[in-house]
Amino acid sequence: MGMRMMFTVFLLVALATTVVSFTSDRASDRRNAAVKAFDLISSTVKKGCCSHPACSGNNPEYCRQGR
């Protein structure tokens, strides 16, 4: 293989590595955002439910978890 061909292969490998790394970072960012949103929603619902006697009476195991 000539020097030019080896350099071209190196550039293609570097580009492919960068693209794979970039897309996997974006996917993990989406997962983290989804987990944070779920935690926020569940804590809000838990506070709302557990502050009402009827709801907390129907879900005792759910309301005891956070307290």
Swiss-Prot record:
Alpha-conotoxins act on postsynaptic membranes, they bind to the nicotinic acetylcholine receptors (nAChR) and thus inhibit them. Globular isomer (C1-C3; C2-C4) selectively inhibits neuronal (non-muscle) nAChR subtypes particularly human alpha-3-beta-2/CHRNA3-CHRNB2 (IC(50)=35.7 nM) and alpha-9-alpha-10/CHRNA9-CHRNA10 nAChRs (IC(50)=569 nM), while the ribbon isomer (C1-C4; C2-C3) shows weak inhibition on alpha-3-beta-2/CHRNA3-CHRNB2, but not on all other receptors tested. InterPro entries: Conotoxin_a-typ. Keywords: Acetylcholine receptor inhibiting toxin, Amidation, Cleavage on pair of basic residues, Disulfide bond, Neurotoxin, Postsynaptic neurotoxin, Secreted, Signal, Toxin. It is found in: Secreted. Disulfide bonds join C49-C55, C50-C63. It comes from Conus geographus (Geography cone). Belongs to the conotoxin A superfamily. Residues 1-21 form the signal peptide. Both the globular (with C1-C3; C2-C4 disulfide pattern) and ribbon (C1-C4; C2-C3) isomers shows no or very weak inhibitory activity on muscle-type alpha-1-beta-1-delta-epsilon/CHRNA1-CHRNB1-CHRND-CHRNE nAChRs, alpha-4-beta-2/CHRNA4-CHRNB2, alpha-3-beta-4/CHRNA3-CHRNB4 (IC(50)=1928 nM by globular isomer), and alpha-7/CHRNA7 (IC(50)=1935 nM by globular isomer). It comes from the Eukaryota. One of its GO terms (cellular component) is host cell postsynaptic membrane. Its main location: secreted. This is Alpha-conotoxin G1.5. The cysteine framework is I (CC-C-C). Alpha4/7 pattern. The modification Glutamine amide is found at Q65. One of its GO terms (molecular function) is acetylcholine receptor inhibitor activity.
